[in-house]
Structure formats: C-alpha cells, structure tokens
C-alpha cells in the first residue's frame, strides 16, 4: 500500500471554495492548501438562509459511497478546535497516519440519501441502515481529494449530539470530487429549504 503516497501532488493553482448557508460567495482563504484539487465546505452553523428554496426539497437524492470510518464522542473542547475546513482535513490526516482511520475504505458500497431531514447511509440493498445524521445535528461538511492519486475524494461530516456536549467525525469516500460537491450542494439546498420554511 502507498502509505508514503501521502505526498500531495502539488498544483500551481490550488483552489478552494466554501459553500455556506449564509453566503454562496467564493472563499479563497484556503488557497494555501496542500491538495491538488478543490475543497468544498458546507458550514451549517448558521441561522440565516440565502432565501433560495427548492420545491423538490421533500425528495431524497441518493449517492453511492464507501464508508471510511468515524471518530466518535470527541469532547466539546476537542470539537471547538475543529471549526474550519482545514482543521477537519488536518485532523483526519493525522488520524489516518496514527491508524485511527484507514487510508482506503472496505470495498462495500453504501447508499447515502440526502434530504431535508438529514443524511441516511444504508446498505446497497437499502435493507439495513448504517448511519442516520439528523439535519439539525450536522455542523459542517467538507469534501476534498484524498491525495492518493486515484481521483477519489473524501467527504467528512462533523456532527454533534442532541445535548450539544460531544462531537463526532464521519468520513466517507466518493467516486469523484464532483460527486462529493454534489452531496454538499444537495445538503445546502436542504438547509436553505428548512430555514426558509421556518420564517414567519
């Protein structure tokens, strides 16, 4: 295995974009990222909506992904250090190097369904549910190139528990950065829809 393949392919134009429920503006502050491709981040820690609603928000978009692993029940103090996209990416990198998370996921594919209720990850026959992430418990979603040179991307979710006392990180592998960005976009639309519907 290419453990030493963690060297990132350098690019003369490392770009990044941040998708936020507050704003859809491009944030180039992540330009120093040692990744060869775009990083997209969804910051859901917001109380404002961009005002864009989607009449199809009740539908569930489905994506085929693989499950890399999770780091669960991080203390509040640890979670506070994972505010930005780069914080999450660096934390996952270190966890992989320390053996807490694998570099490559098992071969089994799962179905990730994204709707206004949140995210559901189930087996490919959709008979068993692996994870459920309620929309209101999702704090941030980040997608980025895994750096292994196979064109795969990682999708990382930061969630909290109902009492807001602990954080967890969930890592999934997508077939491409485009697929990962599509998941971020659907989730962003779901947040917009819910926040818009809550307005008086």
UniProtKB/Swiss-Prot annotation:
Residues 58-200 form the PID domain. GO terms for cellular component: cell periphery; centriolar satellite; cytoplasm; cytoskeleton; cytosol; lamellipodium; nuclear body; nucleus. It is found in: Nucleus; Cytoplasm; Cytoplasm, Cytoskeleton; Cell membrane. InterPro entries: Integrin-bd_ICAP-1, PTB/PI_dom. Pfam families: ICAP-1_inte_bdg. Residues 34-43 have a biased composition (Polar residues). Residues 1-57 are annotated as: Disordered. This is Integrin beta-1-binding protein 1.
């Amino acid at each position: 295995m290419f453990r030493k393949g963690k060297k990132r392919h350098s690019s003369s134009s490392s770009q990044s974009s941040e998708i936020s429920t507050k704003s859809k503006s491009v944030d180039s502050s992540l330009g120093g990222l040692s990744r060869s491709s775009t990083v997209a981040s969804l910051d859901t820690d917001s109380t404002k909506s961009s005002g864009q609603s989607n009449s199809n928000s009740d539908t569930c978009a489905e994506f085929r992904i693989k499950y890399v692993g999770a780091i669960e029940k991080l203390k509040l103090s640890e979670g506070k250090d994972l505010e930005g996209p780069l914080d999450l990416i660096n934390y996952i990198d270190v966890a992989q190097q320390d053996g807490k998370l694998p570099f490559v996921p098992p071969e089994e594919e799962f179905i990730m369904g994204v709707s206004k209720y949140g995210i559901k990850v189930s087996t490919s026959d959709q008979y068993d549910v692996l994870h459920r992430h309620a929309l209101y418990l999702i704090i941030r979603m980040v997608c980025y190139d895994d750096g292994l040179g196979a064109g795969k991307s990682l999708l990382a979710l930061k969630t909290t528990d109902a009492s807001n006392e602990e954080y967890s990180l969930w890592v999934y592998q997508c077939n491409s950065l485009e697929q990962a960005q599509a998941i971020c976009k659907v989730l962003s639309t779901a947040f917009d829809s819910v926040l818009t519907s809550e307005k008086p």
